[in-house]
Amino acid sequence: LERIVVGILPGDGIGPIIMKQALRVLEFLAKDEIAAGKLELRPVSGMTIEDRARLGQSLPDNVLEQVKQCDVLLKGPMVTPRPGEEWPNMVSANSLLRRSLDLFAAVRPVSIPEKNIDWTFFRENIEGEYIWGNKGIQVTNDLAVDFKVQTAPGTERIARQAFEFARKNGKTNVTVITKSNIVKLADGNFLQGVRKVGAEHYPDIEVQDRLVDAMCARMGDETFCKGLQVFVLPNLY
């Protein structure tokens, strides 16, 4: 790209405070590119919780159009209303942004050299429990039902992202994190889908699996985590 447009979306609460300092850093590091017109920092307006509540839209149409004109989005935290709060019970704006822009991979690196930790997490970012937002079913006052959705194409593409990263960065294993011993269909299919991608296209990379509760409880256990490098997991985990 000859010119990169970075959309600036401060968000709610402490978001504008964080963004102010983030922009100080970005403007300093990219001052030459900004001066040369190769980088534009473009504010995106209309996305505060007050704006969204007034319009009754978690992701206003005009905001989405502004975002689509950008190459990169620098975003602060945005309020997702919870039952009992002053705001309407709207769907998460974060989730809608991800789905609208098809941002299916949340990539989270973790590096703690003194503990020999060099991990990269690939979280599927669109499906799972997040896919239906507030469209669950309140059967009675005592019974509510929400949904978990996991598709084969959704699993395959996040798996490919994880394996491609592993191969390009000299990693030798990918670990799948699920609760497939209990959530046997959605999580079971996710586990098998990742294994299939690995077996068919990345036979040089070892596939392991861990249960999400055990992984969380023992992330500080060097024996349990020894040798782990790249992780792939469904949305909620």
Summary of predicted features, one role per range:
Residues 2-6:
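Extreme N-terminal starter segment of soluble prokaryotic enzymes
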Residues 7, 39, 72-73, 104-106, ...:
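Structural motif
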Residues 7-24, 29, 140-213, 227:
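Glycine-rich phosphate/diphosphate-binding loop of Rossmann-like nucleotide-binding domains
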Residues 12-15, 71, 122, 162, ...:
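Buried hydrophobic positions in well-ordered alpha/beta secondary-structure cores of metabolic enzymes
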Residues 19, 85-87, 131-136, 185-190, ...:
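Short acidic, glycine/serine/threonine-rich loops at helix termini
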Residues 34-60, 217-219:
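N-terminal beta-loop-helix "entrance" segment that forms/cooperates
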Residues 51-145, 236:
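N-terminal glycine-rich phosphate/adenylate-binding segment common to multiple enzyme folds
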Residues 64-82, 204-237:
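Glycine-rich phosphate-binding loop
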